[in-house]
A protein has these predicted regions:
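SAM-dependent methyltransferase catalytic region
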Residues: 3-201
Length: 201
């Protein structure tokens, strides 16, 4: 229950090399592919409008580029970060913000390359937690929702209104922040953890 508070700088010492740097490196590769597709496509200018074959070639290149962009956004939406002793959710809050920052950067850079601007899709479901204390688990859920709403508003997007908060569940309907023992299952066997791309905390 926050018995040991970890400040943002220390959290970033884990989140940066485990989440931010690898995902930005992946995006750099995808961005290079997108840039190459767009640069090789026939260009339209005020003096030269594209027609027929050139227009079709440019349309195909832009569709391929957009497909790469959307595939990376899907990667971010499906990315999962787990804190198996999440306390009141400080690591989850920071991880959510960083994943949303990456998505925002990806969408902005894709738009600079000429692709349509994307709306934020990464949400609280990307962070998973396990916490023994019911009170701390509920605080973690609230922290994650506060993080989602604060990020959306701070970056000029409207937060969800109906509902403002929805239950934090994965695709199978399991709580993303689970109130249970992370080490032992109720029958005394080893506890199973949810599938995650990275473990933080």
């Amino acid at each position: 229950l926050g018995a040991h508070y970890t400040d943002r700088d220390k959290i970033m010492q884990i989140v940066n090399p485990v989440i931010v740097e690898p995902l930005l490196a992946e995006w750099a590769e995808v961005k290079t592919q997108i840039s190459a597709l767009i640069e090789k496509a026939p260009q339209e200018t005020k003096a030269k409008l594209l027609r027929d074959k050139d227009l079709a070639a440019r349309t195909r290149a832009l569709k391929k580029a957009e497909k790469l962009h959307l595939a990376f956004i899907k990667r971010l939406k499906e990315f999962r970060a787990l804190d198996p002793a999440c306390g009141s959710g400080n690591f989850l809050y920071i991880a959510l913000w960083e994943l949303k920052n990456i998505e925002h950067r990806v969408n902005s850079e894709a738009e600079e390359l000429g692709l349509p601007r994307g709306f934020p899709q990464v949400g609280p479901e990307v962070v998973l937690g396990i916490e023994l204390s019911p009170y701390a688990a509920e605080l973690a859920r609230v922290s994650v929702w506060i993080g989602e709403i604060q990020w959306m508003r701070r970056n000029g997007f409207e937060a969800a209104k109906n509902p403002v908060l929805r239950t934090l569940k994965d695709a199978e309907g399991v709580d993303t922040i689970d109130n249970r023992d992370a080490v032992l299952a109720p029958d005394g066997t080893r506890a199973e953890w949810p599938k995650a791309d990275v473990v933080i905390g």
